[in-house]
Amino acid sequence: MSEEAKPWSMARVITASSAGTAFEWYDFFIFGSLTPVIAKIFLAGLDPTSALIAALALFAVGFAFRPLGAIIFGAMGDRVGRKATFLTTVSLMGGATFAIGLLPTYATAGIIAPILLVFLRICQGTALGGEYGGAAIYVAEHAANNKRGEATGWIQSSASIGLLAALLVIVATRTALGEEAFNAWGWRIPFLASSILLVISLWMRIKLSESPTFAKLRDEGGTSKAPLREAFARRDSLKQVLIAFFAIMCAQGAVWYFTFFYLQVFLEKSLGLPAATKDMLLIAMTLVSAPLYVFFGWLSDRVGRKPVMLGGMLLALALYFPGSHLIASSVNPALVAAQAASPVVVVTDPATCTVQFDPTGTRRFESACDIAKSLLVARGISYAEATSPDGTTAIRVGSGTLAVPGGEALDDPGLKALKTATGDQLKTQLVTAGYPASADPEAVHYPTLLLVLFGFVVAATALYGPQAAALVEMFPTKIRYTAMSLPYHVGTGWVGGFLPVTSFAIVAITGDIYAGLWYAVGFTALSAVVTILFLKETRGKPLEEC
């Protein structure tokens, strides 16, 4: 059997493998985009805020179980084979996604509805843990040594296909049915439509043969009997796993998720850009990114994986703070001007302030200090903090002052009413001081905004494009599936997945809307240092020598 696929079959290998990865991202964006609807449908027994938090927790379940799936299906892929494993993962993933569209609602089934949803999310997350590694390895083990980066770059670009498919299906369904019908039953259609991707993906993958590299290893009796032990219990292979995580995946989780997720929150929540405008920017960024993954994969075949990925990290580090400030001044110049002319100061007793990190949504944040800070953070307003001489709390905006009462003695409805009333008073005071209620689309300087966003897209794709080839080339064939899957999903699921909530907590602690950038800066800088010191160049290296 040839070690390289013929050109016509290589196209089929790439297409079939990419379909499953596109499916992964389709599911990711569908569930994330429909979180508010899912909260109403499956968690109707909770109050709206708790329901939304619980729905976000359901979304996070997919991240939490990805490393488990990486272990299970990674070992399976190294023992049984690449083809059988990613047929299993795409079937489990597709079946679970389709089944969500058939679930009974809380109104008809009670508590059993969210229980079934949790089970299906666990199935999805576990399956996704084995999907990416299988697809990337399968393509890499078919590709010529001097074209491996370009070939696996197509796997990376499938994220764009999945995102666009999700956005188009949701928008088309909402437009055709109307908001009321969509919320009542139309939300099922995007999940049920996944069956089309599933059938196509299965049809293409069934026709594929086993990876030639793995088939040769299996025929020679060289497959691993205990891939988990060989990957993680042996010092040399464990060292490579750690380098893969710290040199590549920490940066990938930080840079990619910052670019395609955190920036969307920053634009809409912190800067007040209308959601429709933000969505159009996301679509534009996604379209631009699709060919860049392949380009940077191709470039890594010419100049090396290490310099291309390191270039992406360094570009991101150069852009994080100045780029974010440019985005702010381009999107909402009135906000930037108001913060300079009328800075906000929270005057309070620091002893009454708590760290506003609440991923479970169970804390009340009832002190006057916490109420003041949470109201400002929710509006994307930077603030300084000063000590109150008499222990009271007030928000000072320019020359105006708003007294903020505490809510320790109030029940939950009373506390909610207090926060709402104080928030309305704060809004009035901010407007009086020149703070805009939202960004004015007519005042946005789009050339600067698009240029900065393009810079972040280049950084993310330069890092992500060669990533699959680099990871594949770090490990021998007999443990490749196991060894590369775990660092990938810990990096994307945990480093990237926790980026929004951790960055928000940093903003709440410091009062600076830019302080959350330090999370991404820290992980990206760590990866850059580890890449320079420990990551070896593997461009063009035969997989048999890995």
Which ranges hold each PLM region?
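Extracytoplasmic gate region of multi-pass secondary transporters
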Residues: 31-32, 237-285, 323-324, 351-386, ...
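Hydrophobic core of transmembrane alpha-helices in multi-pass small-molecule transporters
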Residues: 109-129, 337-348, 443-462
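Low-complexity, proline/glycine-enriched hydrophobic segments characteristic of transmembrane helices
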Residues: 325-451
